[in-house]
Design a protein with these regions (language model features):
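Gly/Gly-Pro- and Ser/Thr-rich, intrinsically disordered tail segments characteristic of DNA damage-repair
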Residues: 1-178
Length: 178
């Protein structure tokens, strides 16, 4: 699998949305920015989903149609429909791509040891528990992943364990595609 996570600044398209050309020649329709970006991304792959603040594309099946990763990345940047710069990150697991994107947007360094060295604040499932995890001295995905399974699930719920299992490739990812 090859995932690309994209994010635009919150004010990228304005509150009104974006105008999309109609195929029947009628006047352009103005659609909400988030919806318009989703439709735009479907030209690259049929596997597109909004996950939190990121538009996530699974492109492994369509890379050959775009002559590889570099060409696809260039095409995404060149055809960016929003007036603002698009931030992007790529990884073999979508959840890790989103975490890398969050670090990139914040201007933080990207750790080499992924997913173990990723900060917990970049994991959506860990956000409700950040204060407690921090008090326990746990700051990275790897430190939480190393906890015994059953006590961790009792304390933090199954969502965090499931997210870590996905990040380590122990469970498949699934998203509601557009």
């Amino acid at each position: 699998m090859h995932w690309i996570a994209l994010q635009w600044p919150p004010d990228a398209g304005g509150a009104a949305g974006m105008a999309l050309p109609a195929s029947d020649g009628s006047p352009d329709a103005v659609v909400p920015m988030r919806e318009a970006l989703g439709w735009w991304a479907l030209q690259f792959t049929p596997h597109v989903a909004w996950v939190d603040e990121a538009l996530l594309l699974e492109v492994s099946g369509s890379l050959r149609l775009w002559d590889g990763r570099a060409a696809l990345q260039r095409r995404i940047i060149e055809s960016n429909p929003a007036p603002a710069h698009v931030h992007q990150a790529q990884e073999a697991i979508g959840m890790i791509a989103i975490a890398m994107l969050r670090l990139r947007v914040q201007g933080q360094p990207l750790p080499a040891d992924r997913p173990a060295a990723l900060p917990l604040a970049t994991l959506t499932a860990a956000r409700p528990h950040l204060a407690l995890l921090s008090r326990l001295g746990l700051r990275t995905w790897g430190e939480v992943h190393a906890l015994p399974r059953a006590p961790m699930v009792r304390r933090f719920g199954p969502e965090l364990r499931r997210a870590l299992d996905i990040a380590w490739g122990l469970m498949p990812e699934s998203y509601p595609w557009l």
